[in-house]
Regions:
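Short boundary/linker motifs that mark transitions into or out of structured domains
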Residues: 3-56, 61, 158
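DNA-binding patch around the recognition helix
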Residues: 13-24, 29, 109-168
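Short, flexible helical or helix-coil boundary motifs
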Residues: 15-19, 84-91, 126, 180, ...
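Short interface patches used for recognition in eukaryotic signaling and trafficking proteins
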Residues: 37-41, 95-101
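Short amphipathic alpha-helical recognition elements used for nucleic-acid or partner binding
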Residues: 43-95, 115
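DNA-recognition element of transcription regulators
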Residues: 47-54, 101-122
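Short glycine-rich, low-complexity/disordered patches
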Residues: 65-76, 91-97, 109-110, 121-136, ...
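Polybasic (Lys/Arg-rich)
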Residues: 159-185
Length: 185
């Protein structure tokens, strides 16, 4: 009654009802790099700059990324950061990217944890698990959402990678075999 009296019942039911179906929504990244879920009443997820940079990197790599190999993605992270940031302080940007790609620094884990927390604040884990960065130990970390359910602006799609997607996939496979004790001969 309270919610109806305040006119909030309809708003809440329109937002929550689609999420109760436990079916992942499409994810739309706008031209100004905001994140929306069209199938959840256009619910928006807000991330701070560095977690958003990390999130977009993982969205661009559905094959997954081994955290220990993150330095291979430094150029791409820098390009995403420049695209999202309106600051010209290259020193700060380079230091942030250095920390993200340093295996001895926890920065990447902190950013992934923040991403997960933001999604869990907005939806149940059975839905959120499709959207946050996750993975088993000794496996590449990735976002589970199918690439067919993600729409990007061209500016984000057109960022050049230093290494081809195929080479990343081969490196990931080699790392998985190595972790299983299968060495190349």
């Amino acid at each position: 009654r309270f919610l109806k009296g305040k006119g909030l019942f309809r708003l809440l039911s329109d937002t929550i009802a689609p999420m109760l179906k436990s079916k992942p929504s499409r994810l739309r990244v706008t031209e100004d790099f905001r994140l929306f879920f069209p199938d959840y009443n256009n619910m928006e997820i807000s991330l701070n700059l560095l977690p958003k940079v990390v999130y977009f990197l993982f969205l661009r790599h559905p094959e997954g990324i081994f955290i220990k190999n993150l330095s291979l993605y430094r150029h791409e992270l820098t390009q995403i950061y420049r695209l999202l940031s309106h600051r010209d302080n290259l020193e700060d940007m380079n230091e942030s990217i250095r920390k993200l790609t340093d295996p001895s620094d926890n920065s990447i884990y902190e950013k992934c944890s923040r991403i997960k927390r933001v999604f869990l604040q907005k939806m149940s884990d059975d839905l959120a698990q499709h959207y946050y960065v996750d993975g088993y130990p000794r496996q590449p970390k990735r976002i589970l959402l199918s690439t067919g359910m993600i729409s990007f602006p061209d500016a984000l799609k057109n960022i050049k990678t230093v290494i081809s997607r195929e080479d990343y996939a081969v490196m990931n496979l080699a790392e998985i075999f190595k972790n299983m004790g299968i060495e190349e001969k």
